[in-house]
Amino acid sequence: MEKINLESINSMDGHLFEELIGKLLIKMGFHIEENSGSADGGIDIVAHNYEPIVGGKCIIQCKRYSSPISEHTIRDLYGVVTDRKASKGFLITNSTFTSASIKFAEGKPIELMDGDKLIKMLMHLTQPDF
């Protein structure tokens, strides 16, 4: 994975952004399930972590937006996580989250990754091993 910054992510189309997130998840040790088409209930990626205790099925939504992610979007993700009996949901964006969306996610199996966290994670995972 080449070095990347928020400016280059902001210029990506949605499909390329999803591909980047898929590669990131693989680097993090997840196994990616192919997602088929637009009738996905808002799911961009289904990922599995097979680690005992902390592992499970994860539903990932990738949002390459120019405005903050709303509470409504997080509520939708939570509904899908519940319906699909996933252990966790991730909303990964190049943007930020509204305070209402952050508050809604608290105490729920939802992880929010904004643009700053995404860049830090990409930088951490693309550094050479010593």
Predicted features, each with a name:
Residues 1-130:
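Mixed-charge (Asp/Glu-Lys/Arg
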